[in-house]
Amino acid sequence: MLMPPDHCLLATNHCLLPTFPHLSSQILYILTTMLGRVVFYRVFGRLEILFAMLVAAVFCACNNDMSRGDEALRIGDYDRAIANFSKVLDGEPANRDARYGLAIAYYAIAEDKERLKENTLALWERTAREFKILTAIDSSDKVTPLYSTTLFYLARAMLAENEHARVMRLLDESIQLDPSNYFSYNLKALILGGQGDVDGAKKIYAYIVTREPKFASAYVNLGNLYWNAHDYESAWDIWSMGHEALPQDPVLAKWTRVAEDSLKAMVYSGKL
């Protein structure tokens, strides 16, 4: 193909640029360099745009997964909540909201199985793991009460599997996280009493009923310690105190009557 004699094509930066023989070589160099830079920045700019679009797509996908996880959690679809929060964490392991949602979903599943009296050890272990990771991300007090309760449930599940399981460390950590978690105090006192540390158990039960006068189990368990030691008067004192604080509690009502009947029998027999 013939080209005009005063107009040829020069290949620069993979683009065909026109040259003009009557222009000096210096001017031509400047022109071609400038045009090359324009082409370079156009290509580079397109790469930046593509990268930005990719980041936006990933961010949008994460947001969608997060939204779906929140919605699933709200309606009680915990398996789907776990799946969506896990997708977010695959791309962003330190995402606080996704980690919190995942921990809550595992907690809810484990709690549901507790009500059905099913084995929950593996679920509480996983829940505790998620809360532990969460505390490394979020140092606020928002997560500590649930983490504390999780450790209580984990200790109880371990004891259900093996009555000799070492759970004191878990209970102490639970109490440290939430000093108002009287369930952990109560379980710790039960273990101490079973190990023969009756005085230690009594102190914990007394602490519980002083701080939380409507904690029925502490009254029942403290009364049992006195009853087993044949101190029926003290047992009646504790149970009746609990019955007064919680008149609708059937267990306290029952043992208060039992203690009263025993004391009356002892009076009639001259043993008291």
Question: How should these model regions be labeled?
Answer:
Residues 77-83, 111-132, 160-173, 194-207, ...:
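Structural signature of tandem alpha-helical TPR/SEL1-like repeats
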Residues 101, 146-147, 153, 187, ...:
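Canonical tetratricopeptide repeat
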Residues 228-272:
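Terminal, low-structured helical/coil segments at or just beyond the last alpha-helical repeat
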Residues 64-91, 108-117, 156-157:
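Alpha-helical segment of the N-proximal tetratricopeptide repeat
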Residues 65, 96-97, 141-143, 148, ...:
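Helix-start (N-cap) detector for alpha-helical repeat units in TPR-like alpha-solenoids
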Residues 91, 137, 141-143, 177, ...:
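Structural marker of alpha-solenoid helical repeat scaffolds
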